[in-house]
């Protein structure tokens, strides 16, 4: 039974993820901060960490970087990270952090389920639900 660690300082975000990602085949564990994520990963080594970008004094990017750093020194095993982003420009930060996947809020249950399934299966998931500005601007510039 895979364990999914859900990290956010917002109870509503944790509840939404748990309701969507949880099922009889998974165990959901919740964290409210980056340091709590680090402790729980060291104790239980979840199959996936879902982390909110905006979270207390150690947000999603810092937490993801720390998880990857610890894994690179063999202090922790590698655990995939799905990062929840507040805005489209945060994709740059998610890429830089090495997150294996990300979703831009507001969360869509179907995309969240797809992302969790992909990462639990050893894959990646990059939210393509938003259109880059160059794609949006091109039809406007051509008069279309």
Regions found by a protein language model. Give the residues of each.
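Conserved acidic segment of CheY-like receiver
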Residues: 1-21, 49
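Alpha-helical interaction/dimerization surfaces of two-component signaling modules
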Residues: 19-21, 40, 93
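Acidic, metal-coordinating helix/loop segments flanking the phosphotransfer/catalytic sites
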Residues: 32-48
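His-Asp phosphorelay/catalytic-motif detector in bacterial-type signaling
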Residues: 45-47, 72-80
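Conserved phosphotransfer microenvironments
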Residues: 47, 51-69
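Alpha4 helix (beta4-alpha4-beta5 surface) of REC/receiver domains from two-component response regulators
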Residues: 62, 83-103
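C-terminal output helix
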Residues: 107-117
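CheY-like receiver
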Residues: 123-144
């Amino acid at each position: 039974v895979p364990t999914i660690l859900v990290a956010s300082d917002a109870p509503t975000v944790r509840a939404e993820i748990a309701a969507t990602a949880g099922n009889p085949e998974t165990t959901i564990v919740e964290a409210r901060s980056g340091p709590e994520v680090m402790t729980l990963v060291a104790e239980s080594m979840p199959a996936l960490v879902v982390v909110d970008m905006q979270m207390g004094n150690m947000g999603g990017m810092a937490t993801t970087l720390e998880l990857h750093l610890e894994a690179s020194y063999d202090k922790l095993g590698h655990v995939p990270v799905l990062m929840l982003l507040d805005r489209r420009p945060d994709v740059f930060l998610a890429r830089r952090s090495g997150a294996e996947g990300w979703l831009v809020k507001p969360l869509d249950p179907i995309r969240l389920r797809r992302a969790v399934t992909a990462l639990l299966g050893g894959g990646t998931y990059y939210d393509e639900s938003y259109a880059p500005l160059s794609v949006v601007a091109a039809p406007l510039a051509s008069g279309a």
